[in-house]
Structure formats: C-alpha cells, structure tokens
Amino acid sequence: MTCHDKVSDPDPFHPLSAFGCHRCHLGNPHATSTARAHMGMVRNPGDLRVADRTCGSAGCHGDVVDRVKNGVMATNAGILQTLRSHWQGLKPLRTDVQLLLGQETAGDLAMDYYRKMCAGCHLWKPRDDRRDEVGRRGGGCSDCHVADETQAIAQKIVKGQTFHHPGLTTRIPSDNCVKCHNRSARIGLSYFGRYESEGYGTPYEGSGLNSRTLSGNRFYLHLQPDVHASKGRMDCIDCHTGVEVMGDGKHHDDIDTQLDITCEACHVPKFSLNEAELAATERLTRLNERVPVSGGEAVALTKKGTALYNLREKEGKVSFYRKADGGRIQIDTFSRQKPYHRLSGHERISCQACHSGWMIQCYGCHLTYRESGQQVDWLTGAPSAGRWEEKRGHERFENPALGIRGAGSRVYPLSPCQVFFSYDGKGERVDGRPFKVLSIAAFDPHTTAKPSRSCRECHGDPKVLGFGGGQLEGAGVSSPTPPVYVASSSGLAKDFPLDAFLDSTGATLQINSHDGTRPFTTAEVASILFVNLCVGCHDDYGDKIYKDFGKSKRRYLSGEEALPCLSEKNG
C-alpha cells in the first residue's frame, strides 16, 4: 500500500499491512493512477449488495453473510407478515425486502404503507443516505459492527496526516441497536428506562420544550430501567447471540422463531464441556478481547445449542462476563424451591408476566391515507402518489394486560397497537363500518425488575385481565368509571373503552393477532378472579390454602361453616 500509507487499522484482526485496501474495498490494487485504482471501489464493504465479494469472499465470512441475508433484520419478513395479517381482507404474501427492491410499485395499500412508513429500517438499506438517525441505519454488516463511522466521515484526508479508519468490533455498542429498536415495541428505549411520552414536550424547561428528545420530533420520560441495565450495566449483546442477531441460516417469517436467548439460558442454565462448544467459546473469546479466556470451565448453551461464551460454570460457581469490558457478574440461578416459583396454578406463567416493571401500550392512534399527496418510497428513494399521516391517541406504560402468547399456553404481558384507519378516494365521510380491531403482541418488554407483581396486581386488576381500566365489584368486573379514554367524546362511535379486550361477560370486544396471541378466555378469567377473593387475607405464597387450591375452592363453594371467611360472613 503506497497511496494511503497513514491509515489506522480497523481492528487487530484486519491489519492494513495484511489486507491492504482492495481486499475489503475492492478496486484495482495493481493500478498506478488514482482513477484506475478506484475503479469498482466500494465505500462500504459491509453493504449487502457487495458483501459476497467483500466480507463474504473466500477465506473470510461467507457463511455469516449468507445467514445475515436470510435473517429478519435483512428480510423484514416479520414486519411484512404482521402488517398484512392486520390489514383486513388481504391474503398472506410471503415476500422480503430483497424481492421488493426490484419492484417499483406497492400493489396495495398495506405494501404502500410498508414502503413509506417502515422500509427505512433493514440491512439492505444504504448507509449514510441521509443526515439523521435514518441515515445511520442500514449498511449490512456495518450497521452493527462499525461503531465510530460518524467521526470518521467528518475527517478529511490530508497528506502526511493519519486517517483514522472506522473501527470494526464484535463488542457492539447498544447505541447501534437503539438507533433502530426505538419504534414499534420500543424495547431499545424501555431497556434503558426511556418511555416515549405523548409528544407534548412536557415538562417544559424554561420557555422551551423538554430536552429529552428522540428522533422524529418525539420526547421521552425517565422510568425504571431494566435491572440488567441499571444493576448489571449490561449491553444488548450480553444476552443476544450472534446466531440470534445475524440469523441461523434459515428463512424465518417472524422474529420469534429466530430468537435464541431466553431467561432460562442464564437463570436455569445448562452447561456443556463438549469439545465443539468449548472450541466456539475459545474462538469467540479471542475475537472479543475482553471476556477472560476459559480455564476449563463448562459453557452454557441456548435453547438452540449456541455456546454462551460469556456464561460459564466451574465447581458449582456460575460466572457471567460483560462483553464490553469483561466485568464479572455473579448469577442468581432460579430456584424452584421458592414457594412463589412452585405455586400450583402458576405453571404457565412466564418470567416476564411477573417480573416486567412496565410496558409500552398504544391506544386510539389514527392513520390517514391521502391520495392527493406524495411521499418518499424508502425502497426506491423517490416520491410516489399517496401520503400517510399518523396521529396518536394516548399511550400508557403501567399495568400491562396479561394473556396467552401465540399458539402456546404461556402467560405473557400484552402490548396493544390500536390504529383507526381512514381512507376514501373521494374525500367523503364513510359511515357504517364498525372498528373492532386491536392488534396485540406478546413479548418481553425489556423492563425486568427483581420485585414481581403482587397477587392483587394480577388477580384483582381488571386492566391486567383484559377489561380495561376499571374497578372490581366482588367477583365480577364493572365498566371503567370513568373510562381512561372516552371514545364517544372524541367522535368515535364506540360503546366500549379503547383499552378493553373483553366486556364484563368475558366476550371479545376487539382483537387481531397473526400468531394466535389472545386475551384470557371466560373460564380463565373466572379462575383468576376467584383467587382474588382469597388474597386479601391469604397473601402469602406459602399459605396452606394454595397447596391444593382446588380443594380449598371446593370447600368454599360448598359453604363449609368451619372456614373462617364463611363463618364471619354467616355471622
């Protein structure tokens, strides 16, 4: 290398003395003129459009590039499938970003919405095509593995001065994750205790709006961060594995099937001394450069069998190491001997149902499509006919409802996304089309707290059960008094609270879920509410009535006079 001889190494594993420029940036290494040397050169080797010839070239990371192209962060398959499933009347369509990049038009309103409102966040998107947060997104491999590109771009190449090449790293900073994961489920914000507020910019600071701002003219309030962030000082990569983030080589239609990590992977760990897992641990530890080298320790495995190289066990002692600085954390493993973990009837409850401190919830948002306007299509980069406008109703964070996740049976916190949609090509009012669709999703809100919900918070809160904000009357549920959001006062012809999934009889008011996620059934609600009759007095997990609650329930229903609660009632 004779032209750019004063350039820093991207990292210890890609020294310029060995790689030069052309191995990553292409071009002609044998040319003697600048024009010829730069012919065919690429600025971003991580761009998925060229990655097969750069990062994925022979002897480099070919298998990883193939995995990334099939992963949901490149395909957006989960977003596309969910969006179409929520758009009433549309048939499922299996597609992905790479296929859509070759199409000039949307085909239907759902795809037009995706192209103009969602498609600025995927790994096929060119990096630095704008001067805002959206411009920082995309770029294939570089989206995650380049940490300081902004500073590097600001540099000018000056003869005789060292040019600081953007650094490559496997110690991916959480900022690289949050630049994308701050919309929709907003888990990147929630994890660090940031709750996106209603958008008023309050509380005001002097004569101006609040300085706690997010991209897109949004604001946030400080809430309790996830305990892994506040106490453990852990980054996203400390839990989320490379196999999970970059994909496992399979094409997944939703993010759930690509996920690899679980609470149990660390808190009910399974360790291995298998040669293959130990070899993977040694290799990943060497690339990380912060996590200590294993000294004969067993390594933990995820549900897919991925080696968690930063979680190890030796002589009964479990050690977790942060990937950013190698800091050691003593893990508290799960104990089924604790009465609250082995309580009969709680077998289906997920960790998140009890230990999530709060969860973003959106109600009453309005989506308008105007044929007369124009808006940029993120996939073509050019404006096209039709413009979308989003208006929010109200957001909440407290007491998320619980329900059943997907086609399984586990109880999870539910987050709604309620959108009213108006579209009429003639600009006329359309009546007689009732709105009864509330999209719900069950996921980990990333607001883990060591203290769990109390018994009454689950068994005695109508909102948690799916009835919306209200109050209990004995063993039944009344309507909210007043409702959190009065739909009729806002011009919506609805006779139920917007935050209610069920009416007082347990009948479904509004629901839409592409994966089978649902609120509790009438029978499940009745079972949950019956416990609420008891927890006022029997408020300890170890109380003897819970050892065989079915028997206790039968004794109560039979009117057994020896029971203190019935004797007091009869007296």
What kind of region is each of these model predictions?
Residues 14-15, 134-136:
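Short helix-terminating capping/connector loops at secondary-structure junctions
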Residues 135-165:
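Long, hydrophobic, well-ordered secondary-structure blocks that form the structural core
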